[in-house]
Amino acid sequence: MTAQRPTPEQIIRYEKDPKTKIATITFDRPEFLNAPTSMARLRYADVLRAANTDNDVKVVIIRGVGDNLGSGADLPEFMEGNDNPAARLAELRLEDDGVGEVSYPPKGTFRNGATISAWYANSQAGNRALQDFKKISIVEAKGYCYGWHFYQCADADLVISSDDALFGHPSFRYHGWGPRMWTWVQMMGLRKFQEMVF
């Protein structure tokens, strides 16, 4: 059973001011610590791609509603996708792409996990879209900056952080490393990075 979730447009709000040339992306799901659904991550990638092209945008500010930038992905939705190949194909933008019927690799196969993992490395998936953004990006970090939101901080040109901001990624606990760790280490040095993450 799939839970009711807000639309991508409700979770990822986008506004621009052509006069100042500043666009704002707001994560707006505070009751779930601004966790984006897979479709919201796709919208985020699309919005950044549009802002990258738009001559009326020179700077993008990224912020979260409530006390946190965000706690990472919508994990219940991700887990539902493990049993719903149609949801995975939709996330991969393959549900109706004009090439005919596509079957998602079955559970228990290497390709099942590798397919979604490879997709997450693609900027169109919304995980590293900010890394490919060619204009100025500023993230307002506060509260939890965890998982997917940690990526956004790592990929931004400038992070303005509150004193209570907590940076981290679940991979630190479960794998010993995390995507984008090298970005942070290069920017601030290993010791400062180790002090920063929780």
Regions found by a protein language model. Give the residues of each.
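Conserved CoA-thioester-binding segment of acyl-CoA-metabolizing enzymes
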Residues: 1-65, 79-86
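Short secondary-structure boundary/capping elements
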Residues: 6-7, 17, 118-122, 176
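Glycine- (often His-adjacent) and acidic-residue-rich active-site loop
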Residues: 32, 64-125, 145
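Short, flexible helix/strand-to-coil boundary loops that buttress conserved ligand/catalytic motifs
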Residues: 36-37, 73, 82, 171, ...
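Crotonase-fold acyl-CoA enzyme core
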Residues: 128-198
